[in-house]
From Swiss-Prot:
Residues 98-102 are cytoplasmic. This is Uncharacterized protein UL15A. The keyword Transmembrane helix applies. Residues 1-79 are extracellular. It is found in: Host membrane. It comes from Human cytomegalovirus (strain AD169). Belongs to the HHV-5 UL15A protein family. Residues 1-71 are annotated as: Disordered. GO terms for cellular component: host cell membrane; membrane. Glycans are attached at residue 65. Keywords: Glycoprotein, Host membrane, Membrane, Transmembrane, Transmembrane helix. The chain crosses the membrane at residues 80-97. It is a single-pass membrane protein. The keyword Membrane applies.
Length: 102
């Protein structure tokens, strides 16, 4: 379980916000599902800040799958945003050079 979470560890906002939870939670707890399984008030409050992940079923398999899917989609969103900004910047600079030459 721990190995699977580590292999998906990417430096995204989701991973960073949930890394603090893993430090304070029990040994070997899944990152996003720690508060729902243990049932302590502080962790449930912290999980509700994360978002829809807090409403997981609480099973080990489900929360681990949501963790890896969460990090993957956030990582892909960041990549798509960067490529889109790069594309828009390139298009604008190309248009500016083209109209300046005329």
């Amino acid at each position: 379980m721990k190995r699977m979470i580590r292999s998906h560890g990417r430096k995204t906002e989701c991973q960073m916000t949930s890394a603090g939870e893993r430090r304070g939670s029990a040994v070997g707890a899944p990152i996003c599902g720690s508060g729902t399984r243990r049932g302590s008030g502080a962790n449930e409050r912290r999980d509700s800040d994360v978002g829809p992940i807090a409403h997981s079923s609480g099973t080990r398999r489900g929360s681990a799958n949501e963790t890896s899917a969460c990090t993957r989609t956030d990582h892909q969103k960041a990549d798509i945003g960067l490529w889109f900004m790069f594309l828009v910047f390139g298009l604008c600079s190309w248009l500016a050079m083209r109209y300046r030459a005329q």
